[in-house]
Amino acid sequence: MKFISPTIHGLIDYLVVVFLLTSPATFGFTGLLAGFTYVIGIIHLLLTICTEYKLGIFKFIPLTIHSGIELMMGVLLIVIAYTLFSNNSEGKLFYVIFGTVILLTWLFTDYKGIHHKKVETT
């Protein structure tokens, strides 16, 4: 069941940006782990503000493209956890969990808004 509406997904996206941009300070990340997390946060912010949904600002990336990017990023972040951060248990754990959360959000989002449109009565 796709129970996350496009609007709620937009809220989640902005919360993810805040989470990513505050994680290095909150969790004490340094070096590559901190830098990578900031870059991912900025990329996610750009994707979020450019997406064509209620909470987007510039609205030129279709929500279906946003969906595909999130699917790829979720998988890629888990792969990165085991490659780029293979010797950093903190980074590995962070990106396995974060990638999994991205994939679950992708899985449960109604990107077409089909289940969340108002039913018109005649």
Model-derived regions, located:
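Intrinsic N-terminal pre-sequences and regulatory tails
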Residues: 1-7, 11, 112-122
